[in-house]
Curated annotation (Swiss-Prot):
GO molecular function: NADH dehydrogenase (ubiquinone) activity
Membrane topology: Multi-pass membrane protein
Name by which UniProt lists this protein: NADH-ubiquinone oxidoreductase chain 2
Species of provenance: Mareca americana (American wigeon)
Keywords noted in UniProt: Electron transport, Membrane, Mitochondrion, Mitochondrion inner membrane, NAD, Respiratory chain, Translocase, Transmembrane, Transmembrane helix, Transport, Ubiquinone
Transmembrane segments: 1-21, 25-45, 60-80, 95-115, 124-144, 149-169, 178-195, 200-219, 242-262, 274-294, 326-346
Entry similarity comment: Belongs to the complex I subunit 2 family.
Recorded superkingdom: Eukaryota
Length: 346
């Protein structure tokens, strides 16, 4: 790929995201989603490997179908009510169609099948964009229409996402697929609270973005695409691997790390809404995700690779991690004491 193309594509992603999150008209929001889709496809397929081309094709087909559903949903609503305003989604059929369309774009169960395959075929930094930035515009549309959505449908999809994200991640050895199922599981937590507290859903997404970005940047630094590569990287980057372990434990939601905050607040809010069974179910389902986070953390720090070397650490190490990785890792680990202030601001 032309080296000048990447900045143009990244700017296009920023433009598409900005158009979608700042628009009140359905056609403008749809335009932003399409700009995002067309900008990310070259980044997915830039290695020209058959798996990357396959991932780009799968991504294009699913996103095109989802965008068509978004447009059809908005047209159905406009036909029935005469409104093109995003916040005026009042027609019940339009609400169901939009929920399905956004679920496809986000990768919520039962529309999740494309997401792990696309992430597996993408470079690590493109996978980071797919897991974080590309989910922000569709999530914004859900937040803007949250008062019109069906709570029972979203709760069902959320619990299914938490269950399947944890269950399918158990037997994975590829780091990108593990993080794909992690993303599906976290989307379940966001979806279950979306109708009752949109601001808390947004806070959960922000914290998920910080933690996932730190993990992807660390994995990109040590070039770890599977568990065995994570296993052998300790001798070269011990500090980064130790930090990666803490960020993974935070992503799992263990106290006293940052990732515990959104789970704690969501369970508290669900209990206030008299949804104690749903809160208990999603809390129990998060234990499935905890297992593969612990396995990844265990491989990154506690075990050593089987080799004939009689020393624990190589005499040379890689360059120190970049400043963004250090900042994101610190935020991923240390934000829990600030949770009262963050919750008050939200």
């Amino acid at each position: 790929m032309n080296p000048h193309a990447t900045p143009v594509l990244v700017l296009s992603l920023a433009l598409g995201t900005t158009i979608t999150i700042s628009s009140n008209h359905w056609v403008l929001a749809w335009t932003g989603l399409e700009i995002n889709t067309l900008a990310i496809i070259p980044l997915i397929s830039k290695s020209h490997h058959p798996r990357a081309v396959e991932a780009a094709t799968k991504y294009f087909l699913t996103q095109a179908a989802a965008s068509a559903l978004v447009l059809f949903s908005s047209m159905t609503n406009a036909w029935a009510t005469g409104q093109w305003d995003i916040t005026q989604l009042n027609h019940p059929t339009s609400c169901l169609l939009l929920t399905a369309a956004i679920a496809i774009k986000l990768g919520l169960v039962p529309f999740h099948f494309w997401f792990p395959e696309v992430l597996q075929g993408s470079p690590l930094m493109t996978a980071l964009l797919l897991s974080t930035l590309m989910k922000f515009p569709p999530l914004t549309l859900l937040l803007m229409t949250s008062k019109s959505l069906n709570p029972a449908l979203l709760t069902t999809m959320a619990l299914a996402s938490a269950a399947l994200g944890g269950w399918m991640g158990l037997n994975q050895t590829q780091t990108r697929k593990i993080l794909a199922f992690s993303s599906i599981s976290h989307l379940g937590w966001i979806a279950i609270i979306l109708v009752y507290s949109p601001k808390l859903a947004l806070l959960t997404f922000y914290l998920y973005t910080i933690m996932t970005s730190a993990v992807f940047m660390a994995l990109n630094k040590i070039k770890a695409l599977n568990l065995s590569m994570v296993l052998t990287s300790w001798t070269k980057t011990p500090v980064l691997n130790a930090t990666l372990m803490l960020v993974l434990l935070s992503l799992a939601g263990l106290p006293p790390l940052t990732g515990f905050m959104p789970k704690w607040l969501i369970i508290q809010e669900l209990t206030k809404q008299e949804m104690t069974p749903a809160a208990m179910a999603i809390a129990m389902l998060s234990l499935l995700s905890l297992f593969f986070y612990l396995r990844l953390a265990y491989h990154s720090t506690i075990t050593l690779p089987p080799n004939s070397s009689n020393h624990m650490k190589q005499w040379y190490t890689s360059k120190p991690p970049s400043t963004p990785t250090a900042i994101l890792a610190s935020l991923s680990i240390l934000l829990l004491p600030l949770s009262p202030m963050i919750h008050a601001i939200v």
